[in-house]
Structures are given as C-alpha cells and as structure tokens.
C-alpha cells in the first residue's frame, strides 16, 4: 500500500524550514511522515530532545562529553564532532537535505525553539521537525509561528 498522507507535510517543511508537530499520544502516526520525507530524498535523524543540553554547541560546534565514572577511573573528556554539520557534510550526493526529528520537544525552552527555527534559515539543507504536543489527529504549523503564539 502506498503512502496516503504526507505531500502537504513535505511542502510545508520545505517552505517553513522548521515545523511544530502535534501527534496523538498513542504514537505510530508520525512514522508515515518520516517515510514520506525519506521517499522525497531527505535523510532523517530522529533524536530525543530532553538531555541535549546546549543546542548550539551540540548541533554546530565540537563539544566535550564527560562520561560517568564511579571514582575509580580518571575523569576524561571525549570530544564529539558537531552533529548537524557532520551529517550535512556526509550526505549522499542525491539527498535533498537533513531533517532533525526531535521527539518530546515540549521540554525545550522558547529560546531553543527560536534557535532551531533560525538555524534552518542559516543552513539551507537543514530542516527541523519538533514534536511539541498531543492532538487527536496529526497536525503541524511552522515552528516560528508556534513560538510567536506561545
């Protein structure tokens, strides 16, 4: 069976750059929209929003990670490459772009939402979908409009 929904979702994401997504709490519906994005040539990167820390550092700058220790090991710092710029540099040649799909995004602050919306304007091949709440049906709106209204 072909995908029955999602054409308007892809068009709205391409025009807005970042979308606030409302999905039913039982889940499962957002998978068809992710499949629609992949069929249109986008690479999706699903992540959980809680625990990301400083979005600017995590997404676009090299950042240090300190692993947990029990007091018996040396305190170490591992350096990770920037998530978004690393994936954008390594996209397949025929890919339209990278879509960062943030699950449980309602825990992010207004400043973080505004930063994500601004980042999509800076990086043209980068798009963001943030699951910000629940609803009876899947619906979405531009993230910048949702932040302004909140």
Swiss-Prot record:
**Reaction(s) catalyzed by this protein?**
a plastoquinone + NADH + (n+1) H(+)(in) = a plastoquinol + NAD(+) + n H(+)(out); a plastoquinone + NADPH + (n+1) H(+)(in) = a plastoquinol + NADP(+) + n H(+)(out)
**Keyword hit for Heme:** no
- How does the UniProt record describe the way this protein sits in the membrane? Peripheral membrane protein
Q: Which GO terms describe its molecular function?
A: oxidoreductase activity, acting on NAD(P)H, quinone or similar compound as acceptor; quinone binding
User: Subcellular location, in the record's words?
Assistant: Cellular thylakoid membrane
Q: What is its EC number?
A: 7.1.1.-
Q: Which InterPro entries match?
A: NAD(P)H-quinone_OxRdtase_su_N
- Mind telling me which residue stretches traverse the membrane in this protein? none
Q: What class of enzyme is it?
A: translocase
* Superkingdom to which the source organism belongs: Bacteria
Entry GO terms, CC: plasma membrane-derived thylakoid membrane
User: Is Zinc-finger there in the keyword field?
Assistant: no
Question: Keywords on this record?
Answer: Membrane, NAD, NADP, Plastoquinone, Quinone, Thylakoid, Translocase, Transport
Give the quaternary structure: NDH-1 can be composed of about 15 different subunits; different subcomplexes with different compositions have been identified which probably have different functions.
Q: Per the similarity annotation, which family is this?
A: Belongs to the complex I NdhN subunit family.
Q: What does this protein do?
A: NDH-1 shuttles electrons from an unknown electron donor, via FMN and iron-sulfur (Fe-S) centers, to quinones in the respiratory and/or the photosynthetic chain. The immediate electron acceptor for the enzyme in this species is believed to be plastoquinone. Couples the redox reaction to proton translocation, and thus conserves the redox energy in a proton gradient. Cyanobacterial NDH-1 also plays a role in inorganic carbon-concentration.
Q: What is this protein's record name?
A: NAD(P)H-quinone oxidoreductase subunit N
Source species: Thermosynechococcus vestitus (strain NIES-2133 / IAM M-273 / BP-1)
The major lineage groups are: Bacteria, Bacillati, Cyanobacteriota, Cyanophyceae, Acaryochloridales
